[in-house]
Structure formats: structure tokens, C-alpha cells
Amino acid sequence: MQVTEINAEGLKREFKVVVPAQQLETRMQDKLAEIARTVAMPGFRPGKVPMTIVRKKYGGAVMGEILENAVNDGAGKAITDGGLRPAMQPKIEITKYEENSDLEFTVAVEVLPEIKTMDFGTINLVRDKAVVPDAEVDDALAKIAERNETSEPVKRASKSGDVVVIDFVGKVDGVAFPGGTAEGYSLKLGSNTFIPGFEDQLVGKKAESDVEVNVTFPEGYGNETLAGKPALFEVKVKEVRAPKAAAVDDELAKSVGLENLDALKTAIRDEISRELDGVSRMKLKRALLDALSDGHDFPVPPSMLEGEFEAIWKQVEADKEAGRQDPADAAKSEDELKADYRALAERRVRLGLLLADVGRVNEINVTQEDLNRGIMMEARRYPGQEHLVLQYYQKNQEALESLRAPLYEEKVVDFILELAKITDKEVSVEDLRKDPDEASADGEAAPAKPKKKAAAKKKAAE
């Protein structure tokens, strides 16, 4: 087998591979001899079938297998002998093959670039930090109290936010319809639980009032027999109840499983603190990625760039069609937009390659402990359903593997942050949560590079 490099342009490599006819024939004879040792055919004892008959019956299939193996071996040899790291699957084209002649084909491959990393110790970053305001803790307590509110009877007329206890019978064309009758139903006015217009007509009513509620079922109503039809509900208001917020005290804390009010306040403060730490981490990571992007300008494989751009552009077009276009994009021509998003795609690919290379060189790996921690973080996103999340990952290997990429990236980012110089800066909660793409209140400009598009598909290495 002869392998010759015929093109080396940028990250593209192309090789010509020639497999001599005699080598193919030798492989053919070896394989046919192996078959002949065990094959049974009418009129012959096992292992005694003439080779000419074996070749006639099995030669075509065997040669197909031999050619496939020869192509794979040739492509592998071209890559291995050249010490290449392919960026994508090689493209193979058979240029010449006839029976009893040499096999010739080409192998075209894009390789990963040689990456010379910057000195991470020269990176200077500012990490915004914020203290949890007491007002946010108080707001969270008020919301918990609101969720645990009760109600008490009142003698006045009902208003939005009250609960009315009602009996009702719904009729269409004077005939009661299935599911349109209830007794002692508690309805919170303003909750939009019922069809549009129903609750509004019960505002200003007192207990023991009889009310005729006229409404029209929406065209898209789930029950097709009622969709779009006018209806009359005969309603009896049995009771009007005003909401009464739960007291913010130890009993409220106990209702959510904590010992006392101080414990509840601590839990709330810790939760908000974790959220602020997450925002701080996100902004620090973005600043790091900006610095890494500015500090590296190696070429990226064209196919990877094109694939990333196509994925982004497909999402941009889908968002535009759905009415979710980024307002900043509306005034730009398609050519301008494509240039912007291609620059974004190139940044993503370059950063992805850089982080992968840093991880490879420094032998950073995702351990089982990392995966377990990632699963627990996912589970915390679904309070009350944690066990279902755990079961999902236990039974779904593909989903489990999908956690590896973001976990790997975070470990590489942590590695680089350990080497960078970081200065902590106390900021207000409002400034911490401010979108970094917007100019800050003191006039500081956002980074002069393609922004992350709200409407575009998000990737970790932005």
C-alpha cells in the first residue's frame, strides 16, 4: 500500500492511496480459503469444494469486504503516518478500480490546528460580588406567606382577589351541558381559571346573590361541541371570602419543613446567595472567554465552522418566522446578519477547540463523582421531583453522557481561572444582574465583538 500526500493547504490534507492488485488478490485468496475449509455444497464433502466454485459463489461479496477494509486501512495509515488529528470524518473517493487492477482512492481530511496557548497568568479579571439585601429576603418571605394564605368570610361585595364560593349550572341553547355544573366551588376572582368574562361578572356581588353570567366559549376550546358557542351560567354566590396572608412567624417556617423563622430566613438568604454566585460565575466565565478569544487567533477547520454557522442560522430563521427576532437584527440586511453570525460561529468553534486542547494537554477528565454532582444539580432544578430526575439519568445512558460536555468545559474553565489573576469587586445586586451586553450605568461599553444573540442557539463556549 502506497500513501502519498498530494495537497496540504491550511488545515486541509489530501492523500492518494494505491493498493496493488496483487495485495488485493492475496487477501481474496486467504479469505476464500478460509471459507472453503467449512463451506458445504451439494455434491461435495465439507472442505472439499473446488476453489473455482467457491470464488464464483462468494467472490463478489468477499471482494466488497476486502475493498472496504483496504479503504479503511489506507485512510487510517494516511492519518496515523502523518501524525494527524482529524477534525471531522475523512472524505474518501475511489478514483480507480477494475478487476485485477490496482485500487486507487483519495483521502481528504481536515485536521485540528496546532494551538499555542497564551500565558493564562497574564489574564486579569474582575469578579463582581454582591451581598444579599435584606429586602430580597423579606420579599421572599412575603411570597411564601402569600402562597400559604387562607381566607375568611366577609359581608361586603366581592372584588378581584377574593374567593367566591358558588353553585352554577351552565347551559347552551337552554340545555345544561356535561361538565358545566358544580356546587360549592371556590373560585378566586382574577385567577383567570374560567373562560374569559366569567370571573369579571362575579365582581361586586354579595353572598346569596343570584347572577346570570353570559359568556362565549373560545374558538379553540378543548371541547369542540362548545367551542365558539355562547353560554349562560346560572350562578348562586354562597359566600365571599377575603384572602388573609399567613403570618410571617415560626409557624410559617414549620409549614415548609423548617424549625423556626430564623432557619427559614437563613435558607432563603443561602438560596439567593447561590443564585448571585451563579450570576457572578457566569459573568466571570464570559469575561474569561472574551480574554481567551482576544488572545488566540488560530485557524479553525472550515467544515466545523460551516456546521456551526448552519446550526445558528437555522435557529435564527426559525426564531424570525416565529416572531422572536432579535430587535438589533431587524435593521440589518441578510448579508450583514450572516457576517455577524458567522463571526459568532467562528468564535464558538475556536473557543471550543481551545478549551478541548487545554483539557487534553493537562489531562482533565470528568470523573464519576463529577457526573454524580451534575445529576444532583439537575435534580435541584425540579423541587419535589428529584427522585424522578435521578431515575431518568440512571436509566438513560445517552442523557448521562450529555452531561459530560458541560461538566468538562467547567473543569477546564476552573483550571484556567486558577492561573488567572482575579480581583473581587463589591457591586450592587442590580449591577450584578445587569446584562453585560448593555452599556453600564457609568458609561462602560460592552465588549466590541459579536454579541451573543438572544434569538440564536446557545452554546457553552460563548
From Swiss-Prot:
Catalytic activity, EC: 5.2.1.8
GO molecular function: peptidyl-prolyl cis-trans isomerase activity; protein folding chaperone; ribosome binding
Known catalytic reactions: [protein]-peptidylproline (omega=180) = [protein]-peptidylproline (omega=0)
Biased composition (Basic and acidic residues): 428-437
Protein's cellular compartments: Cytoplasm
Stored Pfam families: FKBP_C, Trigger_C, Trigger_N
UniProt keyword annotations, A-Z: Cell cycle, Cell division, Chaperone, Cytoplasm, Isomerase, Rotamase
InterPro entries attached to this UniProt entry: PPIase_dom_sf (IPR046357), PPIase_FKBP_dom (IPR001179), Trig_fac (IPR005215), Trigger_fac_C (IPR008880), Trigger_fac_C_sf (IPR037041), Trigger_fac_ribosome-bd_bac (IPR008881), Trigger_fac_ribosome-bd_sf (IPR036611), Trigger_fact/SurA_dom_sf (IPR027304)
Biological processes per GO annotation: 'de novo' cotranslational protein folding; cell division; chaperone-mediated protein folding; protein transport; protein unfolding
A single Gene Ontology CC term: cytoplasm
Biased composition (Basic residues): 449-462
Top-rank taxon: Bacteria
Segments of this protein annotated with the region Disordered: 428-462
SUPFAM superfamilies documented for this protein: FKBP-like, Triger factor/SurA peptide-binding domain-like, Trigger factor ribosome-binding domain
Annotated ranges, domain PPIase FKBP-type: 161-246
Domain notes: Consists of 3 domains; the N-terminus binds the ribosome, the middle domain has PPIase activity, while the C-terminus has intrinsic chaperone activity on its own.
Family under the similarity heading: Belongs to the FKBP-type PPIase family. Tig subfamily.
Known function: Involved in protein export. Acts as a chaperone by maintaining the newly synthesized protein in an open conformation. Functions as a peptidyl-prolyl cis-trans isomerase.
Name of the protein in question: Trigger factor
Organism: Paramagnetospirillum magneticum (strain ATCC 700264 / AMB-1)
Lineage: Bacteria, Pseudomonadati, Pseudomonadota, Alphaproteobacteria, Rhodospirillales
Encoding gene, per UniProt annotation: tig
